[in-house]
Amino acid sequence: ISSVLIAVTFLAIAFTLGCERLQRSEIGDATAHYTVDATWPQTPDDLAWDQTPGVTVDSEDNIYVFTRCDPAVRVYKTDGSLLRTWAVEDSNGAHFIRIGPAGNVWAANIKSQTIRKYTPEGKLLLTLGEPGRAGADQGHFDKPTDMAILPSGDIFVSDGYGNRRIVHFDATGKYVNEWGQTGTKPGQFALPHSIVADSHGRLYVADRENARIQVFSTKGKLLAVWNNLITPWGLWISKNDDIWVCGSSVKKKEGENALAILPPEDQLVMKLSRKGTVLLRVPLQMTTDPLGKQGELNWIHGIALDSQGNLYLTDIQGHRAQKFVRQP
């Protein structure tokens, strides 16, 4: 089995970052390793791949991959074997995919302007938003990117490329509240690209084009802003409330103070505490070759972990999902 060894640098950097101040402790480091599992996934030759923005893992360690061609949803075991596939409407608008607390599958679609809830087998249960129509009112989205589902069933949608807001719905899909607007000030968004919730109900939003993560209460109160750690593309939260982030280094446009987001100059994964402390920094191999080699990524987008701590990463330009195994 071929593998690509990826050095992982643990950084004990205490970034306790509130809305107005940054506290920093001394920096220490240690080293661990991940390797790419070249046997994962095992996909039939006739199953095509396209841009692959989303990945999630259910309670049984089944891995759901969301790609922009049909069948858009591919479900794999940890050993790489393919369990099942199913199609969605407007697959070329696929974005992030999540598993709710009841085991149902939630999918954000930036083309159909919807958030949809499915059974694990692909039966449609609920649609939020009006398919094919963008808007900024209580019943519409404008390119919604992601959703966080609380144990209560409440739904928080990051909306998105067009509206730059977070929208709250109850478990039945009824509108409750919203907050956010376009901007760079605390509580504003340039692009709310991904969202997760911890076990205490705090919401973590990847404000990608502002190169920061913002933390909110479920009422929309701003709790913290984590600047200059990473340009965050995708988020994942573990059962013990560690926040995993995939993205790229923060960089400025040459000769300007503005941030440069695209194209990314590198590929990173970080593990953060609930206080914004960087617990782990994982530099990944980047390629600009559309084919790429195993272990390389090109516009990393989605991140998920299974119960054994294995990483599942997807990328846009690389058109694939990959598994990385942590080494002792």
Task: Cite the ranges covered by each PLM segment.
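Bacterial N-terminal signal peptides
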Residues: S3-T16
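Eukaryotic scaffold repeat domains enriched in small/polar residues
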Residues: T16-P328
